[in-house]
């Protein structure tokens, strides 16, 4: 049983419409008409009629977003977290000209439930999501499917009753228009063709000249080209031209809509194909009109959206995507049967990192693990890589709650998987030692080294848990050198000082008291 009357596409179209257009039906919006959304739109329009001037000055509003990844009841599947970030990046780009920006509030939530994962519009699934959602954020649920009894595929929907967004996993991308469209519904916008959802225009049923005044659905008025009824018809926004759902079934390359359709005044109807609230696919320059933007801003500032008010400001609007990888170095040998420590230098203004490790250089999704971590280290579990594999790959992307648009374009790091790590000496080094090798915490100690050849080297101090406590890059010329190191960050314990370069690696013991 559905929560409200749903846009029904079965049996309401003429056979001629399906014969011509069925091959072009790739997906549609599942947002349902409801008294709740109707009342909210009317309240927003009433507010604008009186207070529109108050909304002219619009400082940037940061809106908290919570992501809920839905998996099977067995905990399988679920969207890749990178796709959620790409979708959020898209929303920020598309809503930037409205001074509305979204940021990730708290960590990802996970919900293991088959019903929600396949039929999120069912009453049972709706009640589950209502109980799971974050009451102080705009909630996005990502599901594998959105069950429909009608032709085509539901791509996403906003539930006014539960105040949640649901996006089909495959639609969580930067390229898809689904999330900006459904977010328009969240902010009380209707389709530009409101009233034609259940029966898009076709010449057999409606004629070349549409003479009737009431649209097929919801008792909505048929909007006229001259704008005389724009405040009461269709989407009730006057700077969006009439649209009788011409986009449903239209080829998804957004070719010009060249079908001649006239309203009752014999005026040619020309829809806005690249409006976010239309049904035309594959267009460029999707946009909201100023009238739609006003409704969105009024909705965001309404009492109903008080739960979205936040004092958050981003630590930085951008985060560098240059990662200084530390361990393992590119091509380093690691034991495939032991945990593999990954470490990189902290990135300024980053509050978390996406870590990916893979069995293939191309990071194919079926052989790649993606994790979100808040530190600059991650340990791959022992024996993750199969025994016959020779090379593993990894990469890191830095982000913060708002700066989520980074895409990793640098070549990945690799490590060689071995059963026994070879003990290669440093051929450029005559001798080296740590002096003293027993030192009180906070005191200085030295690396004394005698080189027989210049070399770039790395020094790592590793604690008893196998984590890197200190990392330093060094450059030596031929001869003797001393490098002072302070132990202020080292707690008492036993450490391994590892010196390495491309030719080999050697270690010495260090004790902090």
Q: Where would I find each of the regions flagged by the language model?
A:
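C-terminal tail/sorting-segment detector
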Residues: 22, 39-40, 404-420, 492-513
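The catalytic-center signature of Zn2+-dependent metalloproteases
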Residues: 172-286
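Residue-level detector of functionally pivotal "anchor" positions at catalytic/ligand-binding pockets or at interdomain
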Residues: 314-330, 413-441, 452
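C-terminal outer-membrane/trafficking sorting elements
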Residues: 425-435, 439-513
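Active-site-proximal segment of zinc-dependent metalloprotease catalytic domains
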Residues: 126-201, 210
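Propeptide-to-catalytic entry region of secreted or membrane-anchored zinc metalloproteases
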Residues: 23-138, 142-147, 313-318
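Beta-strand-rich modules
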Residues: 384-403
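Conserved aromatic anchor
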Residues: 340-348
